């Protein structure tokens, strides 16, 4: 007879231990979304590829949404990983996939349909939906005028929801949704007459209007609406709460306003005539001087497109011009400045550009070390226009008002005061036409934006120099009256000391 050991007590103990282990495991809390982001060291964000959200230029990633979310990632101490959606429907689909992006940052509007797809943050920007049409066509004035028009909008957009609601009230309104285009494409289609109308947000129209000067606003379709970030509906509140705290913080400390100023504070300085004229001159005048701008800019370590923008603001790229105050040439140098920069003939385009580049680099180098980019560039431009003494007066006024003298957004508020006795009587250098540098900088920033856009990597090469660069919106059959420009000089030398 064999001995049969009894394993039941051991088995019971093993089962009890296993059960306790499983119970304890069940009691361990699952990490929150925010904790997972910090543990992984990566914030995955999905956005759209467009000028108002995110794109890449020769300096890398940029865009309003990108900069705002990059600062958020920096606050969290994690790396930012950007993913781009094929369209808006794809954006929400990707966010709702297991392991997908945890944040959508793409100028999103909270709508009834989207509330089922995501949860939304506090607002950071207000925009107005606008119906746009082509100049020369019949202008719609209300939703009833949309009947019988070919309308195309972005697929899955808040604009598509607006039109669906209008169509429910008026079945005669017909529209198409496209997932093969972006806002820039829609504006081009209107500009070229491929479609009658589209619907875009005011901020995106403002950023792109200059490229399509035939595009006009027909009417606003409803009130201003808030743009927000989105998180997936199935996630906990940890990340959303952190986002809201961050957006509140950048609103209070001025960071958000500075970003708005950087991307939107100068976009409306060109009207139809200005945009039309600049587009023409890009093809007709810039190619003659582009190499000079590039050579001088490289020598002085300045972006050639910024230098070209200064030249356009000063003379509209005309080398033999003279103002009533005696400044001359393509970069409109004074006699004293020209001599200091080694320019013997201000009416020689190459010399003028060299002198202007050298002078701008000198001014920029003289600014306080505490001034960082991009404010350093904007303040240097103001100094280029009004003089370093008056700029310092404006900076001191800003400091006295509790503002930041190193920030262009604050200093530009003070510059117009230099024309008011109440204020200039307290300054070292006295009266100045302080409003001029504000407009000067705004114009140059806009020209620079356009030059940056049309010389992106895919447009590089000889397209500008060869005159083959397509600038949308230029219809030379009926040009508008151009704005006033400096009076061309009849002399090709610089013999008269003005």
From Swiss-Prot:
A GO CC term attached to the entry: cell outer membrane
Membrane topology field: Peripheral membrane protein
Catalysis performed (reactions): Exolytic cleavage of the (1->4)-beta-glycosidic linkage between N-acetylmuramic acid (MurNAc) and N-acetylglucosamine (GlcNAc) residues in peptidoglycan, from either the reducing or the non-reducing ends of the peptidoglycan chains, with concomitant formation of a 1,6-anhydrobond in the MurNAc residue
Subcellular location: Cell outer membrane
GO biological process, one term: cell wall organization
Organism classification: Bacteria, Pseudomonadati, Pseudomonadota, Gammaproteobacteria, Pseudomonadales
SUPFAM superfamilies, per database record: Lysozyme-like, Periplasmic binding protein-like II
Location of the region described as Disordered in the Swiss-Prot/TrEMBL record: 464-498
Protein name per Swiss-Prot or TrEMBL: Membrane-bound lytic murein transglycosylase F
Taxonomic superkingdom: Bacteria
Function noted in UniProt: Murein-degrading enzyme that degrades murein glycan strands and insoluble, high-molecular weight murein sacculi, with the concomitant formation of a 1,6-anhydromuramoyl product. Lytic transglycosylases (LTs) play an integral role in the metabolism of the peptidoglycan (PG) sacculus. Their lytic action creates space within the PG sacculus to allow for its expansion as well as for the insertion of various structures such as secretion systems and flagella.
Main subcellular location of this protein, as a coarse class: membrane
Region annotation (Non-LT domain) ranges: 30-267
Gene designation per UniProt: mltF
Gene Ontology MF terms in the entry: peptidoglycan lytic transglycosylase activity
Pfam families per record: SBP_bac_3, SLT
Comment block on domains: The N-terminal domain does not have lytic activity and probably modulates enzymatic activity. The C-terminal domain is the catalytic active domain.
Entry keywords, A to Z: Cell outer membrane, Cell wall biogenesis/degradation, Lyase, Membrane, Signal
E.C. numbers: 4.2.2.n1
């Amino acid at each position: 007879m064999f001995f049969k050991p009894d394993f039941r007590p051991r088995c019971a103990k093993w089962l009890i231990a296993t059960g306790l282990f499983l119970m304890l495991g069940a009691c361990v809390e699952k990490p929150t979304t925010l904790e997972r982001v910090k543990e992984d060291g990566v914030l995955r964000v999905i956005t759209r590829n467009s000028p108002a959200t995110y794109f890449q230029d020769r300096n890398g990633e940029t865009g309003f949404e990108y900069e705002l979310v990059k600062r958020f990632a920096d606050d969290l101490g994690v790396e930012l990983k950007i993913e781009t959606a094929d369209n808006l429907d794809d954006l929400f689909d990707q966010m709702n996939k297991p392991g997908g992006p945890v944040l959508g940052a793409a100028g999103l509007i909270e709508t009834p349909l989207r509330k089922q797809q995501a949860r939304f943050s506090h607002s950071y920007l207000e925009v107005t939906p606008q119906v746009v049409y082509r100049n020369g066509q019949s202008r719609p004035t209300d939703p009833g005028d949309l009947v019988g028009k070919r309308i195309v909008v972005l697929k899955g957009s808040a604009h598509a929801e607006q039109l669906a609601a209008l169509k429910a009230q008026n079945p005669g309104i017909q529209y198409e949704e496209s997932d093969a285009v972006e806002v820039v494409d829609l504006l081009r289609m209107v500009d070229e007459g491929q479609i009658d109308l589209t619907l875009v947000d005011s901020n995106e129209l403002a950023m792109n209007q200059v490229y399509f000067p035939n595009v006009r606003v027909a009417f606003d379709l409803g009130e201003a609406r808030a743009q927000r970030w989105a998180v997936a509906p199935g996630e906990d509140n940890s990340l959303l709460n952190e986002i809201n705290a961050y957006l509140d913080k950048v609103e209070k400390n001025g960071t958000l306003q500075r970003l708005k100023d950087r991307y939107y504070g100068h976009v409306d300085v060109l009207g139809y005539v200005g945009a039309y004229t600049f587009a023409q001159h890009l093809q007709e005048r810039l190619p003659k001087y582009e190499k000079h701008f590039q050579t001088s800019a490289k020598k002085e370590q300045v972006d050639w497109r910024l230098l070209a923008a200064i030249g356009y603001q000063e003379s509209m790229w005309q080398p033999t011009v003279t103002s009533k105050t005696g400044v001359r040439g393509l970069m409109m140098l004074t006699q004293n400045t020209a001599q200091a920069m080694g320019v013997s003939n201000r009416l020689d385009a190459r010399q003028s550009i060299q002198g202007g580049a050298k002078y701008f680099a000198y001014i920029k180098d003289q600014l306080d070390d505490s001034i960082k980019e991009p404010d350093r560039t904007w303040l240097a431009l103001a100094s280029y226009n009004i003089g370093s003494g008056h700029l310092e007066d404006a900076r001191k006024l800003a400091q006295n008002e509790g503002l930041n003298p190193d920030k262009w957004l604050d200093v530009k508020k003070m510059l117009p005061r230099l024309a008011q006795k109440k204020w200039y009587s307290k300054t070292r250098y006295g009266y100045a036409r302080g409003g001029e540098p504000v407009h000067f900088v705004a114009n140059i920033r806009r020209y620079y934006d356009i030059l940056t856009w049309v010389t992106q990597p895919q447009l590089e090469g000889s397209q500008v120099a060869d005159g083959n660069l397509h600038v949308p919106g230029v219809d030379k059959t009926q040009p508008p009256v151009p704005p006033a420009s400096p009076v061309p000089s009849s002399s090709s030398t610089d013999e008269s000391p003005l």
